[in-house]
Amino acid sequence: MEIDLPFKVEYSKSSRASCKGCKNKIEAGILRIAAMVQSAFHDGKQPNWFHEQCFFQKQRPTSAGDIENFENIRFEDQERIKKAIDNCTTVISAGGSKKGAKRSKGENNAIKDFGIEYAKSGRASCRGCEQKILKDQIRIRKTVFDTEVGMKYGGQPLWHHVECFAQLRGELGWLDTGENLPGFQTLKSDDKADVKKALPVIKDEGVSSAKKAKIEKIDEEDAASIKELTEKIKKQSKRLFKFRDEIKNEMSKDDMVALLEANNMEPVKGDSEKLLDQVADLLTFGALLPCTDCKGRQLLFHKSGYLCNGDLTEWTKCTKLLKEPERKSCKIPGYLKYKFLKDVRKNPEVRAIRYIPPSTSTILKNISLKKGDELDGPKVKRERPPLYNIEIALIAPKEREGIVKDRISKLGGTVSTKITEKTTVVLSTPEEVERMSSRMKKAKTLGLHVIPEDYLEAVEQNGAGAINYISSMSLCDWGTDPATRITQEESKSSKSKSIYTKSVPKSMTLKIKDGLAVDPDSGLEDVAHVYVSRNKEKYNVVLGITDIQKNKNSFYKLQLLESDMKNRFWVFRSWGRIGTTIGGNKLDNFSNLVDAIVQFKELYLEKSGNHFENRENFVKVAGRMYPIDIDYAEDSKIDLSAEHDIKSKLPLSVQDIIKLMFDVDSMKRTMMEFDLDMEKMPLGKLSQKQIQSAYKVLTEIYELIQGGGTNAKFIDATNRFYTLIPHNFGTQSPPLLDTTEQVEQLRQMLDSLIEIECAYSLLQTEDSKADINPIDKHYEQLKTKLEPLDKNSEEYILLQKYVKNTHAETHKLYDLEVVDIFKVARQGEARRYKPFKKLHNRRLLWHGSRLTNFAGILSHGLKIAPPEAPVTGYMFGKGIYFADMVSKSANYCCTSHHNSTGLMLLSEVALGDMMECTAAKYVTKLPNDKHSCFGRGRTMPNPSESIIREDGVEIPLGKPITNDSLKSSLLYNEFIIYDIAQVNIQYMLRMNFKYK
């Protein structure tokens, strides 16, 4: 996969661009350098162009390898840029503090990137400890140029506490004394002394030795061969650019194209400079033969060789890179009479290459883009001040305000005179509490404690008691837990978010008309609807494409809108990157339908490569987008937790369980856990066909893993999967899918998605009965009888014992508390199970699943994975898995500290004769004399303590025993059946997972 380089160089194609430094025009034909920044308007990078001399004032490249197209500029220009990069030192050495010592030009430039001052506010955070820098505290600046903001705006100031800067100064590049920091002279005398003490001179021996090692390394290499290679590149560059200049001045574009095609080479389209490079390379070194992998005829010189620009498949670019590609002599068509063509040599020549790798920071940035930010905590550990993140509102005498504010600030707190939702506590007097002003009344309404000024003295003496003192020293008889009112610090991961993801709305409200949603960005949702033809053709399209090679995760929405009242039409389209604010939209107005349809179809063809009329037989075209099959139905507006005019006839515990199973927020949280895009793929909108296609792609990836597939095939399948199931990666690059763990995780996601789709479709079902409570309606839709058990009944106590006894020793993260037990009778299931009721070896066994899956499970029963699903994750093949240890199944409920409610099933399972296994064995068909598979684990419930019910069903509720002599790779028993009729769900338990 390509490395995303931060800079680009070329000879300007025209004089339209302006320099981002001096703001003057960049004349055509001169060298210009760009910082490549994320475009705010489309899913890709855009160049911010600079004059060569202006570029180095605003940017700090550390390697010529970071500059795209560097290898295609003149040799003398390359050398000059490399020299300028060498002058871009980012380390301020101790030399400047010596008398008479002069700094280098690079150091003088870099010293401007540092500064010291008093914090103007308390908003900025320290980049070392990640805590806020309080107002009037000393802070030190390092301006960086390699961040998203720094690249875009020519530098981003990052602030540090003095102590944190001191610990990171080697990394930040300041080895000099603190008194040489710009701004030092503005500090107070005491503060100057503190800074000098914290930042003494560091001798830069380490830097010198690094330089020395570099020189020694070069000496060890064959200096003669380096010189020879450099001379060869210089000569070749001179000859190549002689041709290039003559081609540019004399040859027409048509003749360039004809010359390339005569040599069986595909001309570059849409980039005049690259076309010039391609023709000059042909005349200098000979004609390139087609790529052996994809048969592509466009190989372009790129960094360390010739990169094929062809397509391996309609989903994947070719990744072939050749250092010495095969060539043949350049053919000159007889009708081309340019004089300089006589200088073309008969025999092809090998192009000399000097590869300059990208800088370490660029490589690391690309790795983090692929993997996502690692949450490794702050770089510097620093104790927080006692009132950190505590906002104190003052209702105090004016004469005390200044003194109190200073004390609070020194303790790390923030002060306000307004009382808001963000206020933690109010500092006031007993008299003010007695007086009960409007502000004090508001404090009471918000449940804010009122504390005296003595509180500050107590905190100054013992900072650890800051929270407890609020309650113990309170002057009022009201107040909620103050700990819940402290502002939660933003996590590192959210701080490192892109500027294009921080303001993305979590969801959007769609107004549905005739089953189709008008995009609210059009501004026409109240006056127009999506046009549907007489043939029921819906002029509403969502296209998408994910390309991990180019870090693209794009969408394109296209709608033909018709006015609700007048004979008026619009074509609306919006585009961008999924999960970000990157993108734009456009609305075109039409007075007649024919013109609107023509434009709609032209745009569809342009973006997808397919005619709108043929969309049912869509064929993916390389580099073009693919339709996402989304069915926009009316969003559910039913709030099951709200009061309803008609009372429910169900027991309260059953009502609660229905609310849980049909909780839309819970469904949305589950989808967001899987990084699914909630705007392009809202709840209940992705078609079954699309999900089945995604299953097939996962199966294909699994087979590639098993068979050792090529990287290109993994890229191809990854692009297809993420296009079918839109994911929100923000500005991060979509990860390559090439491990069984990823396949298993995504299979579980699709399993959950199917069940969520099922539950949501039940929520959408229209019901003619208006005289029924919504909870009762959804209960009826499940076609399942749920009867709560009496908590004092023998049955309840027996099942509670089953839970208590079979919690495995290795599952210590949580305890299980039984909240409710329901007797379950699914409609038609007893009849289906009847033939197996006579089978021997029937047991009551556990099955756990996500809470959001249960509406689907109860409405259609437990299911076996579809044929198109990958086999990964199924130790014993595709079947329904059960356990006799409660915690073994409980782990599949996917609960957490924050979502601690889970549902579990106890089912009567007809096991009959079991095929016993002690290690993974993928079962596609059981032997004729077996009814189920038994994965025997080393630990199991004591069989002698099992209870046999009157109907012959075994309840294995004995305490665990371990068979140390058994050689098994399984810790606990697993029971698998391959026929859904062998299951009869009998109980559902609502569990509280009490995490430790």
Swiss-Prot record:
Q: What does this protein do?
A: Poly-ADP-ribosyltransferase that mediates poly-ADP-ribosylation of proteins and plays a key role in DNA repair. Mainly mediates glutamate and aspartate ADP-ribosylation of target proteins: the ADP-D-ribosyl group of NAD(+) is transferred to the acceptor carboxyl group of glutamate and aspartate residues and further ADP-ribosyl groups are transferred to the 2'-position of the terminal adenosine moiety, building up a polymer with an average chain length of 20-30 units.
Tell me, in one coarse class, where this protein mainly resides: nucleus
Can you give the residue ranges of the WGR domain?
A: 527-625
Swiss-Prot/TrEMBL catalytic activity: NAD(+) + (ADP-D-ribosyl)n-acceptor = nicotinamide + (ADP-D-ribosyl)n+1-acceptor + H(+); L-aspartyl-[protein] + NAD(+) = 4-O-(ADP-D-ribosyl)-L-aspartyl-[protein] + nicotinamide; L-glutamyl-[protein] + NAD(+) = 5-O-(ADP-D-ribosyl)-L-glutamyl-[protein] + nicotinamide
Source superkingdom: Eukaryota
Further comment found in the protein's record: The ADP-D-ribosyl group of NAD(+) is transferred to an acceptor carboxyl group on a histone or the enzyme itself, and further ADP-ribosyl groups are transferred to the 2'-position of the terminal adenosine moiety, building up a polymer with an average chain length of 20-30 units.
Limits of the BRCT domain: 382-473
The entry's family comment says: Belongs to the ARTD/PARP family.
GO molecular function of the protein, one example? NAD+-protein-aspartate ADP-ribosyltransferase activity
Q: Does the keyword Nucleus apply?
A: yes
Which residues of the sequence carry a binding annotation for Zn(2+) 2?
A: C126, C129, H161, C164
Motif Nuclear localization signal: which ranges? Answer: 211-214, 232-235
Q: Ranges for the PARP alpha-helical domain?
A: 647-764
Official protein name in the record? Poly [ADP-ribose] polymerase
Q: Show which residues constitute the signal peptide.
A: none
